[in-house]
Amino acid sequence: MRINPTTSDPGVSTLEKKNLGRIAQIIGPVLDVAFPPGKMPNIYNALIVKGRDTAGQPMNVTCEVQQLLGNNRVRAVAMSATDGLTRGMEVIDTGAPLSVPVGGATLGRIFNVLGEPVDNLGPVDTRTTSPIHRSAPAFTQLDTKLSIFETGIKVVDLLAPYRRGGKIGLFGGAGVGKTVLIMELINNIAKAHGGVSVFGGVGERTREGNDLYMEMKESGVINEQNIAESKVALVYGQMNEPPGARMRVGLTALTMAEYFRDVNEQDVLLFIDNIFRFVQAGSEVSALLGRMPSAVGYQPTLSTEMGSLQERITSTKEGSITSIQAVYVPADDLTDPAPATTFAHLDATTVLSRGLAAKGIYPAVDPLDSTSTMLQPRIVGEEHYEIAQRVKETLQRYKELQDIIAILGLDELSEEDRLTVARARKIERFLSQPFFVAEVFTGSPGKYVGLAETIRGFQLILSGELDSLPEQAFYLVGNIDEATAKAMNLEMESKLKK
């Protein structure tokens, strides 16, 4: 952890001058610390416990002050395991909140909640640090213009467009392509917007975090040969870590993203996986801090904690942070306080469907379940809005007819319904797209499709101009011209076979 960026050896030369306290009580990950009268630390100050455990091994535990209890005592939450700590151990008040490294040197690296690199690649080459607790940008700094954040992914841009500086909820189970979609977005923002990404793994499985890192190296999102060319910084606070680390790792990732937005004036993508674990960690700590639980056992400060994180994710006149947050819904209950509080902050939802993944349609984004507040004629324009609505109507009608088709077959449908089904199947396939990050697995080159090209393609399918083309011509292509070229190739291949 960096305490003071002005010293050559951060966190050492300044510590001797700081206030010293003693551990008075240990309740799991929560410590009570007694300080001399008049030397009390401020709330959110970082405290460091240095000493030796009962086995004689050196210990270095960082804590964060949460409450001032009176009688010269404070209550703090530990950011690492408290095993081996004993009453009476010396505690150093650093006089400042937790600070983490920021800037270009963080790209391609993995950090823990304290901003310490955990990838065995040596120290981070930066002296610039930033405290993890900051207030949200003032109203006067905000960019109030509603603009679309183009991702180059057809299904997202057309049917559930992302807002620049907005918050998107990503819903999907295991194995439906969440990770690949996240990596493609990281890749596309780097290429199309010259932006960077920060990934915050909040309370996720260690194996998943490791898999993501390996896949990013394989797909080129993290460049092993030249780490500075990487497009993403990773911050992990895994499931096995104490609740203090899981509660604050989201803020560490956000602080790194804010630097790219405010100082480098870039468009930043911030991924949080999983936002529910942030709430869960807060509820674990809340009871230990002596707060009365609220509905369903959650912390009474749930809305405040969520708001303090979400309100910092926004567009300013310098740049933007667009956040994509994986949302776990406990027991599929959308009225649970954790997802319900999250929904209040979201501008769009991207729902991944296991049914589409089973059909081999990737990205497996459900076009009917995914929503966006940006899909309004005054924001996206009349043409975009009308095409999106017609695409949804066609797919909805196809969904309604599927039971009839399953029982009676296509022949029993009216001419109009048969045409609707044919176009819907083409639309469904045209919503698929080859990804850059999947090239190493599929062998197909990735495609970035601009919004205008996307609208033109669906306009041609809906108008009936392409009714004569086979539906497989629309599968895993970029723009509509590639679909017509693929149809010609398929026709030539079938003629040669004859």
UniProtKB/Swiss-Prot annotation:
EC number(s) per entry: 7.1.2.2
GO molecular function, one term: ATP binding
GO biological process: proton motive force-driven mitochondrial ATP synthesis
Localization per Swiss-Prot or TrEMBL: Plastid, Chloroplast thylakoid membrane
Positions with a binding annotation for ATP: 172-179
One Pfam family linked to the record: ATP-synt_VA_C
Any GO CC annotation of this UniProt entry: proton-transporting ATP synthase complex
Membrane-spanning segments: none
Reaction(s) this enzyme catalyzes, per UniProt: ATP + H2O + 4 H(+)(in) = ADP + phosphate + 5 H(+)(out)
Keywords: ATP synthesis, ATP-binding, CF(1), Chloroplast, Hydrogen ion transport, Ion transport, Membrane, Nucleotide-binding, Plastid, Thylakoid, Translocase, Transport
Gene3D superfamilies in UniProt: 2.40.10.170, Bovine Mitochondrial F1-atpase, Atp Synthase Beta Chain, Chain D, domain 3 (1.10.1140.10), P-loop containing nucleotide triphosphate hydrolases (3.40.50.300)
Residue ranges that the Swiss-Prot or TrEMBL entry lists as coiled coil: none
Function statement: Produces ATP from ADP in the presence of a proton gradient across the membrane. The catalytic sites are hosted primarily by the beta subunits.
Oligomeric form and interacting partners: F-type ATPases have 2 components, CF(1) - the catalytic core - and CF(0) - the membrane proton channel. CF(1) has five subunits: alpha(3), beta(3), gamma(1), delta(1), epsilon(1). CF(0) has four main subunits: a(1), b(1), b'(1) and c(9-12).
Similarity comment: family membership: Belongs to the ATPase alpha/beta chains family.
Record-given protein name: ATP synthase subunit beta, chloroplastic
Organism in which the protein naturally occurs: Spinacia oleracea (Spinach)
Lineage, highest ranks first: Eukaryota, Viridiplantae, Streptophyta, Embryophyta, Tracheophyta
